Regions:
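PRPP/pyrophosphate-binding module of the type I phosphoribosyltransferase fold
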Residues: 2-17, 22-29, 171-254
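N-terminal juxtadomain amphipathic helix
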Residues: 2-99
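ATP-binding/phosphotransfer module of carbohydrate and carboxylate kinases, centering on a glycine-rich
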Residues: 36, 128-133, 165, 251-253
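Generic hydrophobic alpha-helical segments
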Residues: 47, 118, 122-126, 196-200
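Short, well-ordered alpha-helices that flank and scaffold nucleotide-derived cofactor binding pockets
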Residues: 49, 124, 161-165, 227, ...
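Extended interfacial segments that mediate partner engagement and assembly in macromolecular machines
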Residues: 56-162, 189
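Arginine/glycine-rich "motif VI" loop of SF2 helicases in the C-terminal RecA-like domain
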Residues: 83-86, 165-166, 234-238
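A short coil-to-beta-strand element that immediately follows conserved catalytic motifs
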Residues: 87, 137, 167-175
Protein backbone atom coordinates (compact mmCIF):
# COMPACT_ATOMS: atom_id res chain seq x y z
CA UNK A 1 0.00 0.00 0.00
CA UNK A 2 1.38 3.38 -0.98
CA UNK A 3 1.82 6.23 1.47
CA UNK A 4 -1.04 8.30 0.03
CA UNK A 5 -3.85 5.74 0.66
CA UNK A 6 -2.46 5.11 4.16
CA UNK A 7 -2.59 8.83 4.89
CA UNK A 8 -6.19 8.90 3.66
CA UNK A 9 -7.15 6.02 5.96
CA UNK A 10 -5.42 7.72 8.90
CA UNK A 11 -7.21 10.96 8.07
CA UNK A 12 -10.56 9.16 7.90
CA UNK A 13 -10.13 7.56 11.32
CA UNK A 14 -8.75 10.76 12.84
CA UNK A 15 -11.75 12.70 11.56
CA UNK A 16 -14.13 10.06 12.87
CA UNK A 17 -12.45 10.09 16.28
CA UNK A 18 -12.66 13.88 16.43
CA UNK A 19 -16.37 13.80 15.58
CA UNK A 20 -16.95 11.09 18.22
CA UNK A 21 -15.15 13.12 20.88
CA UNK A 22 -17.09 16.25 19.96
CA UNK A 23 -20.37 14.38 20.36
CA UNK A 24 -19.26 12.66 23.57
CA UNK A 25 -18.00 15.79 25.31
CA UNK A 26 -20.10 18.40 23.53
CA UNK A 27 -22.05 21.03 25.36
CA UNK A 28 -25.74 20.16 25.51
CA UNK A 29 -28.89 22.24 25.65
CA UNK A 30 -29.98 22.57 29.29
CA UNK A 31 -33.59 22.00 28.26
CA UNK A 32 -33.75 19.29 25.56
CA UNK A 33 -30.17 17.93 25.83
CA UNK A 34 -29.48 18.40 22.13
CA UNK A 35 -25.80 18.89 21.29
CA UNK A 36 -24.74 22.55 21.00
CA UNK A 37 -21.59 23.26 19.01
CA UNK A 38 -21.72 27.01 19.58
CA UNK A 39 -19.21 28.40 22.05
CA UNK A 40 -21.72 30.41 24.06
CA UNK A 41 -25.34 30.00 25.09
CA UNK A 42 -26.99 27.25 27.13
CA UNK A 43 -29.95 26.58 24.83
CA UNK A 44 -30.15 25.15 21.34
CA UNK A 45 -31.66 27.39 18.67
CA UNK A 46 -35.08 25.72 18.92
CA UNK A 47 -35.36 26.05 22.71
CA UNK A 48 -33.97 29.58 22.51
CA UNK A 49 -36.72 30.55 20.08
CA UNK A 50 -39.33 28.98 22.36
CA UNK A 51 -37.94 30.92 25.32
CA UNK A 52 -38.11 34.20 23.41
CA UNK A 53 -41.72 33.43 22.52
CA UNK A 54 -42.90 32.76 26.08
CA UNK A 55 -40.97 35.64 27.67
CA UNK A 56 -41.75 38.42 25.22
CA UNK A 57 -45.42 39.12 25.95
CA UNK A 58 -46.97 42.00 27.87
CA UNK A 59 -48.53 41.13 31.19
CA UNK A 60 -50.66 42.62 33.96
CA UNK A 61 -48.43 43.99 36.73
CA UNK A 62 -51.11 43.22 39.31
CA UNK A 63 -51.70 39.50 38.62
CA UNK A 64 -49.01 38.48 36.11
CA UNK A 65 -51.34 37.14 33.43
CA UNK A 66 -50.61 37.61 29.74
CA UNK A 67 -52.50 40.67 28.54
CA UNK A 68 -52.09 43.52 26.12
CA UNK A 69 -50.94 46.75 27.73
CA UNK A 70 -54.09 48.34 26.32
CA UNK A 71 -56.29 45.96 28.35
CA UNK A 72 -54.86 47.20 31.64
CA UNK A 73 -56.99 49.91 33.23
CA UNK A 74 -56.14 51.61 36.53
CA UNK A 75 -53.49 49.01 37.28
CA UNK A 76 -55.50 45.82 36.69
CA UNK A 77 -56.66 43.63 33.81
CA UNK A 78 -60.15 42.22 33.09
CA UNK A 79 -59.23 38.92 34.74
CA UNK A 80 -58.05 40.31 38.08
CA UNK A 81 -60.17 43.44 38.42
CA UNK A 82 -62.58 41.76 40.82
CA UNK A 83 -60.02 39.54 42.56
CA UNK A 84 -58.74 40.13 46.08
CA UNK A 85 -54.96 40.20 45.76
CA UNK A 86 -52.81 40.87 48.82
CA UNK A 87 -49.49 41.44 47.06
CA UNK A 88 -49.09 44.94 45.64
CA UNK A 89 -47.44 44.12 42.31
CA UNK A 90 -45.81 41.23 40.47
CA UNK A 91 -42.92 40.76 38.05
CA UNK A 92 -42.45 37.60 35.98
CA UNK A 93 -40.11 36.16 33.38
CA UNK A 94 -42.77 34.57 31.19
CA UNK A 95 -45.55 32.01 30.88
CA UNK A 96 -45.17 28.43 32.07
CA UNK A 97 -44.83 26.80 28.67
CA UNK A 98 -42.30 25.21 26.32
CA UNK A 99 -38.61 25.61 27.18
CA UNK A 100 -39.24 27.86 30.21
CA UNK A 101 -41.43 25.15 31.74
CA UNK A 102 -38.78 22.53 30.98
CA UNK A 103 -36.01 24.55 32.62
CA UNK A 104 -38.10 25.22 35.73
CA UNK A 105 -38.89 21.52 36.13
CA UNK A 106 -35.18 20.71 35.80
CA UNK A 107 -34.35 23.46 38.30
CA UNK A 108 -36.80 21.96 40.82
CA UNK A 109 -35.24 18.51 40.56
CA UNK A 110 -31.60 19.61 40.40
CA UNK A 111 -30.54 23.06 41.66
CA UNK A 112 -27.53 23.06 39.33
CA UNK A 113 -29.56 22.69 36.16
CA UNK A 114 -30.66 25.85 34.37
CA UNK A 115 -29.76 28.00 37.40
CA UNK A 116 -27.59 30.41 35.41
CA UNK A 117 -30.19 31.02 32.69
CA UNK A 118 -33.15 31.27 35.09
CA UNK A 119 -31.22 33.65 37.35
CA UNK A 120 -30.49 35.86 34.36
CA UNK A 121 -34.18 35.87 33.41
CA UNK A 122 -35.22 36.64 36.99
CA UNK A 123 -32.83 39.57 37.23
CA UNK A 124 -34.10 40.89 33.89
CA UNK A 125 -37.69 40.68 35.14
CA UNK A 126 -36.71 42.36 38.40
CA UNK A 127 -34.95 45.24 36.62
CA UNK A 128 -38.08 45.81 34.52
CA UNK A 129 -40.45 45.70 37.48
CA UNK A 130 -42.41 48.62 38.90
CA UNK A 131 -40.97 48.11 42.39
CA UNK A 132 -37.21 47.63 41.94
CA UNK A 133 -36.28 50.67 44.02
CA UNK A 134 -38.65 49.87 46.89
CA UNK A 135 -37.46 46.46 48.07
CA UNK A 136 -35.96 46.01 51.54
CA UNK A 137 -35.99 42.20 51.66
CA UNK A 138 -36.22 39.29 49.26
CA UNK A 139 -38.23 36.54 50.96
CA UNK A 140 -38.27 33.11 49.28
CA UNK A 141 -41.56 31.24 49.52
CA UNK A 142 -40.64 28.58 52.10
CA UNK A 143 -40.89 24.80 51.84
CA UNK A 144 -42.02 22.66 54.75
CA UNK A 145 -38.98 21.15 56.44
CA UNK A 146 -39.96 17.65 55.28
CA UNK A 147 -40.08 18.77 51.64
CA UNK A 148 -36.78 20.58 51.98
CA UNK A 149 -35.16 17.51 53.53
CA UNK A 150 -36.44 15.30 50.70
CA UNK A 151 -35.34 17.68 47.93
CA UNK A 152 -32.20 18.95 49.63
CA UNK A 153 -32.80 22.63 48.87
CA UNK A 154 -35.48 25.28 48.41
CA UNK A 155 -35.44 26.39 44.77
CA UNK A 156 -36.97 29.75 45.70
CA UNK A 157 -34.09 30.44 48.09
CA UNK A 158 -31.53 29.41 45.44
CA UNK A 159 -33.13 31.92 43.08
CA UNK A 160 -33.40 34.69 45.70
CA UNK A 161 -29.70 34.39 46.54
CA UNK A 162 -28.83 35.10 42.90
CA UNK A 163 -30.84 38.28 42.57
CA UNK A 164 -28.83 41.45 42.06
CA UNK A 165 -29.94 44.48 44.06
CA UNK A 166 -27.98 47.40 45.53
CA UNK A 167 -29.66 47.30 48.93
CA UNK A 168 -32.16 44.48 49.47
CA UNK A 169 -31.13 41.43 51.49
CA UNK A 170 -32.41 37.86 51.43
CA UNK A 171 -34.32 36.99 54.60
CA UNK A 172 -35.68 33.60 55.70
CA UNK A 173 -37.66 34.55 58.81
CA UNK A 174 -40.83 33.63 56.94
CA UNK A 175 -41.48 29.90 57.37
CA UNK A 176 -43.96 27.18 56.49
CA UNK A 177 -45.42 25.72 59.69
CA UNK A 178 -47.85 23.22 58.22
CA UNK A 179 -47.34 20.58 55.57
CA UNK A 180 -49.82 21.00 52.72
CA UNK A 181 -50.93 18.95 49.75
CA UNK A 182 -49.50 19.86 46.36
CA UNK A 183 -51.40 22.79 44.91
CA UNK A 184 -51.25 21.19 41.46
CA UNK A 185 -53.37 18.29 42.75
CA UNK A 186 -56.33 20.63 43.32
CA UNK A 187 -58.59 21.84 40.56
CA UNK A 188 -60.38 24.79 42.13
CA UNK A 189 -59.08 28.08 43.47
CA UNK A 190 -61.18 27.58 46.61
CA UNK A 191 -59.44 24.26 47.36
CA UNK A 192 -56.02 25.82 46.89
CA UNK A 193 -56.84 28.77 49.14
CA UNK A 194 -58.09 26.42 51.85
CA UNK A 195 -55.02 24.21 51.47
CA UNK A 196 -52.52 27.00 52.25
CA UNK A 197 -54.63 28.87 54.81
CA UNK A 198 -52.55 29.25 57.97
CA UNK A 199 -49.62 27.33 56.49
CA UNK A 200 -47.11 30.17 56.95
CA UNK A 201 -45.82 32.27 59.83
CA UNK A 202 -43.04 34.70 60.72
CA UNK A 203 -40.30 34.01 63.23
CA UNK A 204 -40.05 35.92 66.49
CA UNK A 205 -38.11 39.20 66.06
CA UNK A 206 -38.55 39.19 62.31
CA UNK A 207 -37.49 42.41 60.51
CA UNK A 208 -40.58 42.97 58.35
CA UNK A 209 -42.42 45.66 60.32
CA UNK A 210 -42.70 48.77 58.16
CA UNK A 211 -40.57 47.19 55.41
CA UNK A 212 -41.24 46.42 51.77
CA UNK A 213 -40.83 42.76 50.96
CA UNK A 214 -40.50 40.90 47.66
CA UNK A 215 -41.64 37.28 47.67
CA UNK A 216 -39.64 35.01 45.35
CA UNK A 217 -41.12 31.83 43.86
CA UNK A 218 -40.80 29.65 40.77
CA UNK A 219 -44.36 29.43 39.42
CA UNK A 220 -47.63 31.27 40.06
CA UNK A 221 -50.72 29.36 39.00
CA UNK A 222 -53.89 30.60 40.72
CA UNK A 223 -51.87 32.79 43.07
CA UNK A 224 -53.26 31.16 46.21
CA UNK A 225 -49.83 30.53 47.75
CA UNK A 226 -48.47 34.00 46.98
CA UNK A 227 -51.69 35.57 48.23
CA UNK A 228 -51.55 33.72 51.55
CA UNK A 229 -47.87 34.58 51.97
CA UNK A 230 -48.54 38.25 51.27
CA UNK A 231 -51.47 38.29 53.68
CA UNK A 232 -49.38 36.79 56.48
CA UNK A 233 -46.50 39.20 55.86
CA UNK A 234 -48.82 42.21 55.95
CA UNK A 235 -50.46 40.90 59.12
CA UNK A 236 -46.93 40.75 60.56
CA UNK A 237 -46.42 44.43 59.74
CA UNK A 238 -44.93 44.58 56.24
CA UNK A 239 -45.72 47.90 54.56
CA UNK A 240 -45.86 46.41 51.06
CA UNK A 241 -45.43 42.96 49.55
CA UNK A 242 -44.36 42.37 45.95
CA UNK A 243 -43.85 39.11 44.07
CA UNK A 244 -41.22 37.93 41.61
CA UNK A 245 -41.79 34.62 39.81
CA UNK A 246 -40.14 32.75 36.99
CA UNK A 247 -43.42 31.93 35.29
CA UNK A 248 -47.19 32.33 35.43
CA UNK A 249 -49.09 29.18 34.47
CA UNK A 250 -52.21 29.04 32.29
CA UNK A 251 -53.24 32.60 32.99
CA UNK A 252 -53.38 34.30 29.62
CA UNK A 253 -56.32 36.54 28.88
CA UNK A 254 -58.21 35.58 25.70
Amino acid sequence: MTKQPIDKVKGFFAGGLETFNRLLWAKRCINCREVIFEADGDLCSSCGQQLNLVTSGDYCRRCGRDVSEYAVFQGSCPRCREEEIFFDAIARCGIYEQSLRGMILSFKSDSGKATKTLSFLANSALSGSTFLGEIDYFVPVPLHWTSKMRRGYNQSLVLAERLIHPAAKVNTDFVRIRRTKKQTSMASVHQRLKNVKGAFAVRYRHPYIGKKVCLVDDVKTTGATLNECARQLKDAGAAKVFALVLAVADQRVD
